[in-house]
Structure formats: structure tokens, C-alpha cells
């Protein structure tokens, strides 16, 4: 009942505000001009995403004197893990192919109010352990869908309601679409936003409902950014995560489809600094620093081994952790614009009977960083693709610009745990560690990105990981991961 009510209220509010804007425009000589060019500029500002491929001149038509624009992309992604593990890529898959069609429509209803609707048709095909062949899983996925109001009532504040995109520069905090209301404002040098988010329905048609880990979770997201000098900025972040779902009790039987292992009330705060200094023509030094702290409390629900649907224990503990990620990138004044990167990430660690001091990320992150390349890729390596928790990660990278707008990068990662533990948090594959050593291992990624055409994007990744002493008997074993992605925009 909540979703229809919210939609109805939003439509009523939109009708009222649109009518108010129409009246204001009739008497306000400063109202923005209604032109196709203005609509196009607004569309690009509100909908442009780094992880999507779009043409600069999409299909458009005139409706009631305003421009309706339709665009999208077709994408094919394939990834493979070797050797096959008990739990490799995404829930036991050792190979995964995804074919998708994404389409979107943008329409400026008035000079101040705009609508955007995005949807995806997708199909996944996977091979699992033992060469068990699975058929295609087809689904419809809702993407961004929102109503945007610019400087509503002349307040200088923008309002957005619907399924919104949240992301930061390095995806260290956020890279997710959420059902939310967001208010934002600012100037050329300063900007801020405040949002409230809660999932109102399932995001894909092949899901039974809202993800149990997202059910009844309310988030408050705040951000403020200041460009204090040219090419130098500082951003402040805050995220309050409140899980209001009912925590299961010992002995309770819960269907596997609705298992929720964690109910948490957490708050993240932190800052991001970034800048670039031009040393001489075609030579520059880029730097970044991300710092964060998380605190709150969590209830961990444990299920039985022999009765996997029965709750056997509920562990309650405090969460106190911190993390930092810093790096430098030096671009040399040589043919091919070679660049050298050095980065280091560190987190807190330690667990007592009532307090977990290991940092964990927001759960909305993706840890993608461009390292000066044509497109961003996995900050902490593609084979492990782990979450920054109880870790020390040293990174060395070298990259080149090839052709006109493409790139090739070779990146090395060295992984160590802050304290010995028997698991890695949210890694691509599950493998029990000994808990006796901190050396997780090392990884090497080769990443190629081709962007020579406005419409076509090709990405290829070859990654390898060598297990360290923390893997015990598996130390020295190599794991390999490969991925190819093709996107064609329209």
C-alpha cells in the first residue's frame, strides 16, 4: 500500500507545483527560455553517467512544445573464474554471461520540472561447478525513475523524487540506485545534498520481493562539496543506516529466501580530498585521500548447519571502525601520456566479545577508480573484488593512452590482513583462511578500454591472484579471472 500512496501523492504534488510554475512563468520575466537546446543541456546534466554509453544526438521528438528524448544501450558482458571454486562468481557461478537492453526517456514538462524513466531487459546465463548447464534467466529491471524540480519556488533548491542514482567520484561510498527523496543546492564552487531512502519494491522481476537485507532499511545520506581552488576539492559525507526489520529469535524457523543475517544501526562519516597540480605542459600530479569512520550496533543472526532454516544464535555487538585510502598518480610528458600510480589503503581491526573494530563499507559501494584510464575499474583488484575491511592494500600501477581515447593499464596489488582472520569480507569467492597469518597474497590486473567510437565501448580485463600464507595448504595457488564487456549506445 505504501508504494501506490507515495506515487499518488507525488503525482498530486507534481500537478500542483507544475501549475504554480506555469502561473509564475507568466509573470516572471526571468523564467528560463523553453528551447530544445535548453532541454538537451538539462538532460545531459541530470542523466549523464560514467558507466553508461550514450550517443550525443539521441532520437527526440516534440510534444506540447517540449522535447522528449529517448536513448539507451545494448550491452553484452561475460566473465569467467578459474579454477572453479565452491562459491565463485555471484552465488556459485564460475562463468556468467549477461545480455541487456537499457532504454530511457527524458521529458521536460516545464522549465522547472522534468521526468525521467529508465528500464532494462536482461538475461543471464551461468555455468556452475561440475559443468552443470543452466538456461537463461530473463528479467525486467527498473532503473532510475524520477521527477526533478529545479529551484522549486525560486528557493534555489532542487528536489528529486523516485528511484535515484547515488555515486561518488571513486565509488568508495556510493554507487547504487535507491528509492529516495533528495534535496540539493549550491553554487559553482559549493554544492550539497540531503536524501532519505527506503526500498519500496523489488528491483527485478525474477526476485520474490525486496532483498531481505534491504527490507525496512531507512537511510539518510548527506554530502557537501567545495572546490576551494581550481582542480582541488574537498567533500564531506554522512550516511545513517537504520534497519527496522524484526530480528529473529533463537529457535525460529525462517525460509531461506528471506534470510537476513544482519540487522544494524550504523552511521558513517568521512571526507574525501582530491586535487591535481600541473607541473609543466602535459605533466601533472594527481592525489586523493578518502577517510571514514563507522559506528553503531549490529545483531548477527546465525543459522544451523544441519537445520539451515533454524536460528541457532543471535550475536549483538557494537561496531567501531575506521579506514583510509590515499594515492598519487603522476602523468609524464611523453608520447602515450604514460602514468604511474601508487596507492595504499588501511583499515582498523580487532574484535572483542562485545565490540567489532573492523571497518566495513556502506554496502552501496563498488570501489571503482579510473587511475587516469579511459574508464574506471576495480580499485582493489578484479579477482578478489573484496570489500575494504581488516585490510592493508598496497597498489602500484602503470598505464598508457593508446589511439585517440583508449587506454591500457597494468596494476599490482599486495594484500595483508590487519589481524589474522578466517575469512575475507565480501570477496568474489569464499575460501576459509587459517586465521594464523596475515598474508592474503598478491594480484595483477591488465585492463584494456577502447573508446574510439562515440557509440561503442569495449572493455577487457585479465586478472590473476596468487594465494598467500593465510590460505594455509592452498598458499601459492593461482586464481584467474577474465571479463569482456561490449556496450553500444543509441
Name each region found by the language model:
Residues 5-14:
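Bacterial N-terminal signal peptides
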Residues 15-93, 104, 108, 340, ...:
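N-terminal periplasmic/intermembrane-space "pro-region" immediately following the signal or transit peptide
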Residues 53-55, 84-89, 129-130, 164-165, ...:
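Extracytoplasmic loops and strand-loop junctions of Gram-negative outer membrane beta-barrel proteins
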Residues 71-73, 116-118, 237, 288-290, ...:
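Outer-envelope exported proteins of Gram-negative bacteria
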Residues 80-99, 107-159, 166-175, 299-317, ...:
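Surface-exposed loop and membrane-interface regions of Gram-negative outer-membrane beta-barrel proteins
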Residues 153-158, 167-168, 172-354, 401, ...:
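Signature for the C-terminal beta-barrel architecture of outer-membrane proteins
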Residues 346-439:
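C-terminal structural cap/anchor segments
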Residues 478-490:
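Outer-membrane beta-barrel "beta-signal"
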Amino acid at each position: 500500500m505504501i508504494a501506490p500512496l507515495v506515487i499518488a501523492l507525488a503525482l498530486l504534488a507534481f500537478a500542483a507545483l507544475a501549475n504554480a510554475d506555469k502561473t509564475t512563468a507568466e509573470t516572471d520575466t526571468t523564467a528560463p527560455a523553453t528551447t530544445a537546446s535548453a532541454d538537451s543541456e538539462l538532460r545531459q546534466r541530470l542523466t549523464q553517467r560514467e558507466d553508461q554509453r550514450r550517443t550525443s544526438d539521441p532520437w527526440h521528438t516534440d510534444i506540447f512544445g517540449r522535447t522528449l528524448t529517448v536513448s539507451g544501450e545494448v550491452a553484452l558482458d561475460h566473465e569467467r573464474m578459474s579454477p572453479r571454486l565452491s562459491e565463485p562468481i555471484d552465488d556459485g557461478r564460475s562463468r556468467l554471461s549477461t545480455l541487456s537492453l537499457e532504454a530511457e526517456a527524458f521529458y521536460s514538462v516545464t522549465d522547472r520540472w522534468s521526468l525521467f524513466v529508465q528500464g532494462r531487459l536482461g538475461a543471464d546465463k551461468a555455468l556452475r561447478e561440475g559443468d552443470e548447464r543452466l538456461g537463461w534467466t530473463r528479467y525486467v529491471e527498473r532503473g532510475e525513475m524520477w521527477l526533478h524540480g529545479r529551484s522549486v519556488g525560486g528557493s534555489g533548491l532542487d528536489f528529486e523524487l523516485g528511484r535515484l542514482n547515488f555515486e561518488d567520484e571513486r565509488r568508495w561510498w556510493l554507487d547504487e540506485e535507491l528509492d529516495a527523496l533528495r534535496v540539493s543546492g549550491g553554487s559553482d564552487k559549493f554544492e550539497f545534498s540531503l536524501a532519505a531512502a527506503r526500498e519500496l519494491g523489488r528491483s527485478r522481476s525474477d526476485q520474490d520481493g525486496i532483498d531481505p537485507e534491504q527490507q525496512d532499511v531507512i537511510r539518510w545520506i548527506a554530502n557537501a562539496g567545495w572546490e576551494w581552488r581550481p582542480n582541488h576539492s574537498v567533500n564531506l559525507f554522512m550516511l545513517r543506516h537504520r534497519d527496522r526489520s524484526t530480528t529473529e529469535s533463537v529457535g525460529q524457523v525462517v525460509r531461506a529466501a528471506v534470510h537476513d543475517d544482519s540487522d544494524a544501526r550504523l552511521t558513517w562519516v568521512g571526507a574525501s580530498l582530491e586535487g591535481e597540480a600541473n607541473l609543466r605542459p602535459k605533466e601533472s600530479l594527481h592525489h586523493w585521500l578518502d577517510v571514514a569512520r563507522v559506528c553503531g550496533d549490529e545483531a548477527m543472526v546465525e543459522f544451523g548447519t544441519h537445520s539451515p532454516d533454524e536460528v541457532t544464535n543471535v550475536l549483538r555487538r557494537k561496531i567501531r571502525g575506521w579506514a583510509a585510502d590515499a594515492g598519487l598518480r603522476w602523468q609524464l610528458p611523453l608520447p602515450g601520456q604514460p602514468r604511474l600510480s601508487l596507492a595504499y589503503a588501511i583499515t582498523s581491526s580487532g574484535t572483542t566479545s562485545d565490540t567489532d573494530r573492523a571497518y566495513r563499507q556502506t554496502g552501496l559501494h563498488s570501489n571503482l577508480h579510473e587511475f587516469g584510464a579511459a574508464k574506471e575499474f576495480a580499485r582493489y583488484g578484479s579477482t578478489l573484488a573484496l570489500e575494504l575491511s581488516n585490510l592493508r592494500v598496497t597498489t602500484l600501477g602503470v598505464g598508457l593512452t593508446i589511439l585517440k581515447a583508449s587506454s591500457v593499464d597494468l596494476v599490482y596489488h599486495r594484500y595483508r590482513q590487519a589481524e589474522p582472520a578466517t575469512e575475507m569480507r565480501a570477496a568474489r569467492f569464499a575460501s576459509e583462511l587459517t586465521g594464523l597469518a596475515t598474508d592474503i597474497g598478491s594480484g595483477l590486473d591488465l585492463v584494456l578500454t577502447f573508446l574510439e567510437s562515440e557509440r561503442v565501448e569495449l572493455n577487457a580485463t585479465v586478472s590473476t591472484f596468487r594465494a598467500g600464507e593465510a590460505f594455509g595448504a592452498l598458499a601459492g595457488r593461482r586464481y584467474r579471472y577474465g571479463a569482456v564487456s561490449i556496450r553500444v549506445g543509441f
